[in-house]
Amino acid sequence: MLEVKTISVEDTYEIRHRILRPHQSIEQCKYKEDHAEGSFHLGVFYDGTLISIASFSPQSQPLLTEASAYRLRGMATLEGYRDQKAGSTLIKHAEHKLAESGVQAVWCNARHHVKGYYAKLGWKELGEPFDIPGIGNHIVMYKTLRTSR
């Protein structure tokens, strides 16, 4: 059974490093926004094992018109668990949490090869593809949230 929990930023580093940035040092897996006011980190546990992580921080996106936005960063699921729907469970949980707190949109710089994954979750492309040196092609993806406020 999958369980989504708030985790510490330190709990994200191993999976971030292993899945997203294996060619970089663990220090390069730490983002300046990790400790920003309002930031939070979620993990999905399967039978007590942390299998999926993501970080969220209040950050506007110049191409978005929504006044209140959060950025998703460091989304990753361990290879052996990708058929468990941990990532989509995590994203849906975060979208609900953000909408409940009045956040109007969530966005990310998605790796180009996974943009279809976000599209299936109702996210849309924004702007033109771009390259992040050493990591690869990306596209901004976003979703407008239905707030309860």
Swiss-Prot record:
Keyword Cytoplasm tagged: no
Highest taxon in the source lineage: Bacteria
SUPFAM superfamilies per the UniProt record, alphabetical: Acyl-CoA N-acyltransferases (Nat)
Entry annotated with the keyword Acyltransferase: yes
Enzyme class: transferase
Recorded GO MF terms: N-acetyltransferase activity
Positions in coiled-coil regions: none
EC number of the protein: 2.3.1.-
Keywords: Acyltransferase, Transferase
Ranges of residues in domain N-acetyltransferase: 2-146
Entry's family note: Belongs to the acetyltransferase family.
Protein name: Uncharacterized N-acetyltransferase YitI
Species per Swiss-Prot/TrEMBL record: Bacillus subtilis (strain 168)
